[in-house]
Regions:
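Acidic, turn/loop-rich segments in luminal/extracellular domains of secretory-pathway
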Residues: 1-3, 7, 13-23, 27-37, ...
């Protein structure tokens, strides 16, 4: 009687230490001695979010150190990679340790293209946050139309961008640098840490009729 041999998982280590935000964990290979069709996947208590795509162990969206999703929230994920040929299943346990990486602050929900009606002073609210929870502040840092704007602060991390002119901008008579009604502004967010990591965002503010 012919014996069906199990699939063989190769080139997959038993442990990995990776920086956060990485989605592609490891590439490996699977062969079947009888060339049977294989089902390859991931199981285990920490397997939510993991998948195998073309023999790549993958985590959807990248592993986040600040918001671990492993079962005991310690940033150590233990999963089982399996290969099943319909007769036999081969498995390999893999432990993945996630390391913290300093991350720059973020402008929350702010798009680089902003639209504001003419004669309206407040252009857009601003909210900034640091992924690690450090203090953060923001301000106007540049842009050819910088002189036409100011900040209105609620606190260090929240506020608004506004025209200096209380009447806002005139659609019919734009006063931006090239008179096209699209105002160019640059805003900067910076962490209150020794590293002072920063994020700079270029804004295009279009005044509408």
């Amino acid at each position: 009687m012919e014996v069906n041999n199990p699939p063989v998982i190769s080139d997959l280590l038993t442990s990995y230490t990776l920086d956060e935000n990485i989605a592609e964990i490891a590439t490996f290979s699977v062969t079947d001695p009888e060339s049977n069709q294989l089902t390859i996947g991931v199981s285990g208590d920490d397997s939510a979010g993991f998948s195998v795509v073309s023999n790549l162990l993958y985590f959807e969206g990248g592993l986040n150190y600040e918001s671990p999703s492993d079962s005991n929230a310690d940033n150590v994920y233990t999963v089982t990679v399996f290969a099943d040929d319909g007769f036999n299943r081969s498995t390999q346990d893999v432990e993945i340790t996630v390391s913290d990486v300093p991350e720059s602050p973020e402008f929350v929900g702010l798009d680089s293209n902003v639209f504001v009606e003419e004669n309206v002073r407040i252009v857009t609210p601003i909210s900034v946050a640091d992924p690690e929870g450090s203090g953060v502040s923001w301000g106007i840092s540049g842009g050819v139309d910088k002189a036409l704007f100011r900040t209105l602060s609620v606190d260090a991390a929240n506020g608004s961008i506004a025209f200096i002119d209380f009447d806002g901008a005139d659609y019919e008579e734009p006063n931006d640098a090239n008179s096209d009604g699209v105002y160019e502004l640059q805003v900067r967010a910076v962490e209150d840490t020794p590293e002072a990591l920063e994020t700079i965002l270029d804004l295009l503010i279009t005044v509408t009729d």
